Regions:
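Hydrophobic/aromatic beta-strand elements that line small-molecule binding cavities or substrate pockets
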Residues: 18-20, 68-74, 101-109
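A short, structured loop/turn motif at beta-sheet edges
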Residues: 26-27, 73-80, 107-116
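Beta-strand/loop substructures that line and gate deep hydrophobic ligand-binding cavities in soluble
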Residues: 92-142
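Hydrophobic pocket/interface hotspot
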Residues: 29, 39, 58, 72, ...
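Short beta-edge strand/loop motif at the mouth of beta-sheet-based domains
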Residues: 11, 17-18, 37-71, 80
């Protein structure tokens, strides 16, 4: 199994990014990142997604962090999906306001031995504390994507 590098913060671009390799087919990875029953096994505590089309909305829930509304912004099966999500501010009038939320974009590519998975999360510049948010999400992507790898490689 390939050892995957940790996430990187780019404070100049206000992004967090990570690239990993998963020993699974692109179809299996696509299902794991787009079907709510699979998503809930590796990404937070629970996931609710209406459908996987641009404009669809849902909620991702995380222990200790609460519920985060999401809206699909881009979808090109089985290669790319991007979703906007709120920053968890319980007082936000519109939690998916483009000026107060971030977008995470997953891109999949077939490689020898499986699938390359890239995530880039952008939009931190509009949040109340961009540096703290980027660092928090960096750690989150490290943990969650490690869970995705374990899940797709036969973990629980």
């Amino acid at each position: 199994m390939t050892e995957n590098e940790p996430s990187l913060v780019d404070s100049g671009e206000f992004t967090v990014r990570r690239t990993i390799t998963i020993a699974a087919s692109i179809e299996k990875v696509w299902a794991a990142i787009t079907e709510a029953t699979h998503v809930a096994r590796w990404f937070g505590r629970s996931a609710v997604l209406d459908t996987v089309t641009v404009g669809s909305v849902g909620i991702f829930s995380f222990d200790g962090h609460g519920d985060f509304p999401v809206r699909i912004e881009e979808c090109d099966p089985p290669r790319t999906i991007a979703s906007r999500w709120g920053d968890g501010d319980p007082h936000a009038v519109d939690p998916l306001d483009p000026d107060r939320s971030t977008v995470f974009r997953f891109v999949l590519d077939v490689v020898d031995g499986g699938t390359q998975f890239r995530v880039v999360e952008s939009g931190f510049g509009g949040l109340s504390d961009p540096a703290a948010s980027m660092e928090s999400h960096r750690g989150g992507w490290d943990a969650e994507l490690d869970e995705l790898v374990a899940y797709l490689n036969g973990g629980s």
